[in-house]
């Protein structure tokens, strides 16, 4: 397993926000910034890179990125002694994250195009080169790693949240959360290998109700929220 000790981030109660809103309910935030490269992407990257290592033909990972994915991919590739290639849109990347990717030894390729153009390029490369693994969220193992947030929230609260709000880009992370909650609630859960599903903990999981998940997007880039195309 290729790990940088990701996960187990704190769930922090926002007492001041509750007071400001006059809320008669509890508000919590999951501090994913405490992951190794500063984002939830590390949860998925440990899975994606670990699975890539299982294929002896793969010696490189590749991603298109405007920020967090580039830093995470570069860090985990370095840990696994794999080469990392990052495709970035022209002038459209968070420089702090780009600096991380460079520091971890990734090869950076800037294109005259947007993120979607970059995604098309990396998919074509991976289709043509059997030694290259795509580690963007279209990689299903990324989603499997990121769903662990839901499990942690359930453990830390001791129950399901009633509502879960989170930002949405291409919807990979909100999908991962939903998969996690569905597994916890028993909608797609098989059984515990240790107790065959008979312990008190497993019983509480199987009867947990699904939360309402609400995604939100920045006003300048909200294609899912508005149904409009943004360049």
Predicted regions and their residues:
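PLP-dependent amino-acid enzyme catalytic core
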Residues: 1-231
């Amino acid at each position: 397993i290729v790990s940088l000790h990701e996960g187990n981030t704190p769930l922090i109660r926002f007492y001041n926000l509750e007071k400001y809103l006059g809320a008669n309910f509890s508000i919590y935030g999951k501090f994913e910034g405490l992951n190794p490269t500063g984002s939830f992407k590390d949860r998925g990257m440990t899975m994606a890179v670990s699975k890539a290592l299982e294929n002896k033909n793969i010696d490189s990972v590749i991603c298109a990125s405007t920020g967090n994915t580039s830093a995470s991919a570069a860090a985990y590739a370095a840990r696994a002694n794999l080469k990392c290639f990052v495709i970035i849109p022209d002038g459209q990347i968070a420089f702090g994250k780009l600096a991380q990717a460079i520091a971890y030894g990734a090869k950076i390729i800037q294109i005259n195009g947007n993120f979607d153009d970059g995604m098309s390029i990396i998919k074509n490369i991976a289709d043509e080169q059997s030694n290259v693994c795509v580690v963007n969220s279209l990689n299903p193992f990324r989603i499997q790693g990121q769903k662990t947030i839901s499990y942690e929230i359930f453990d830390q609260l001791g129950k399901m949240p009633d509502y879960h709000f989170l930002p949405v880009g291409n919807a990979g992370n909100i999908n991962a959360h939903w998969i996690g909650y569905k597994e916890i609630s028993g909608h797609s859960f098989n059984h515990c290998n240790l107790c065959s599903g008979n312990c008190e903990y497993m019983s509480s999981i199987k009867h947990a109700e699904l939360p309402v998940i609400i995604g939100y997007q920045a006003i300048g880039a909200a294609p899912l929220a508005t149904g409009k195309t943004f360049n």
